[in-house]
Design a protein with these regions (language model features):
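Non-catalytic scaffold segments within catalytic domains of secreted glycoside hydrolases
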Residues: 1-5, 16-186
């Protein structure tokens, strides 16, 4: 007995929809139903993250988050999860650290899928924001009282030279890219 009141876990999108389409893998749904039921039975609130670095390979093969089609696929996935689990889940996180997904995955290449293309990173940023909004709407249709949000990795932008306008502007640009894109859009 850990004495915890809540447990955050991620649902693996490929475990439920291996090809990223609408063809369900029932064994995946069964697994998460058992997990959620066990948490509820133990008096622990399940808190779900829908995306934490596990895009179905078929979607990545079509350029992943840099392809706008992923927005509809994510919305369909969120709808299916809300329908299957929403009677026991009140707190939903759509995407874990979308900045990392977009920039570290598509611009810097240090995270999957390891791309190094600024334009792909901008597209991925746009599509993760759209996917978050679409998933939020989809969950709210099924679970109107649910709390839905993002997990955002905030970065402290500290300006060492407030009298130097170039430094001030650069700090504002970094804050916009690292933080504001995600927290001010919603």
């Amino acid at each position: 007995d850990l004495g915890v009141s809540a447990y955050r876990f991620s649902i693996a999108w490929p475990r439920l929809f291996p090809k990223g389409d609408t063809v369900r893998e029932e064994r995946g749904f069964d697994f998460y139903n058992r997990l959620i039921d066990a948490l509820v039975a133990a008096g622990i609130e399940p808190m779900v993250t829908l995306y934490h670095w596990d895009l179905p390979q078929a979607l990545e093969d079509k350029c992943g988050w840099a392809n706008r089609d992923v927005v509809k696929a994510f919305e369909d996935y969120a709808t299916a999860c809300a329908q299957a689990f929403g009677d026991r889940i009140s707190t939903w996180i759509t995407i874990n650290e979308p900045w990392c997904v977009s920039w570290l995955g598509y611009s810097n290449g240090v995270h999957a899928p390891g791309k190094k293309d600024f334009n792909l990173a901008v597209a991925a940023s746009h599509h993760t924001a759209l996917a978050h909004a679409a998933a939020t709407r989809a969950i709210k249709v099924v679970c109107p009282d649910a709390t839905v949000g993002l997990t955002v990795n905030m970065n402290n932008i500290h300006n060492e030279s407030p009298e130097d306008q170039d430094v001030v502007d650069f700090a504002a640009l970094n804050d916009s890219n690292l933080n504001r894109w995600w927290i001010d859009a919603f």
